[in-house]
Amino acid sequence: MKFLKYLSTILVSLILSINTAIAEKWDMALAYGAGNFHSANATEFAKNVTEKSGGKLTIVTHPGGSLFKGGEIFRAVRTGQAQIGERFMSALGKEDPLLEVDSQPFLATSYSDAMKLYKASKAEIVKGLDEKGLVFLYAVPWPAQGLYSKKQINSVEDL
């Protein structure tokens, strides 16, 4: 009887140690396709996490809305359906109007301006996300508002 008790203690210890030794895998929901620079940054972030954690945490990216569509990512992470997600912040304005601050026309017209705006708004954004049970990890600037064309536009006539 003592032997069985001893054996069960060893088995429980083994099971517990196996669970702590197993690397953890997180699925990261991404709205944009793999070729988009936001997805490329998320993939690099995931790679860095795996390397820096010594493989204890692996983040698998799911670009193009393959895990959750863009509009579903915020809720999916909040409810634990996805461990991590990346989303264009201003698309979350219904969750918190402050998240739209960087998309106000002409407020930040360059990457330098975007960095200043980010630094000025980050603390409140972090606080707002924290109140929703989320952790702000990083930000990637989106190109400033502009006119996109296949040909160069130098005058009104070019339009």
Residue ranges of each PLM-predicted region?
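Short, polar/charged alpha-helical segment
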Residues: G35-V60, E124
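Extracytoplasmic "Venus flytrap"
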Residues: D27-E44, G64-F68
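Sec/Tat signal peptide C-region and signal peptidase I cleavage site
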Residues: S17-A23
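Contiguous mixed-secondary-structure segments that line small-molecule binding/active-site clefts
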Residues: A46-K47, Q83, F88-D158
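Alpha-to-beta junction loops
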Residues: G54-L57, I73-R87
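Short helix-initiation/N-cap motifs at beta->coil->alpha
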Residues: H62-R75, N154
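A local structural motif
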Residues: N48-S66, L134-V135, E157-D158
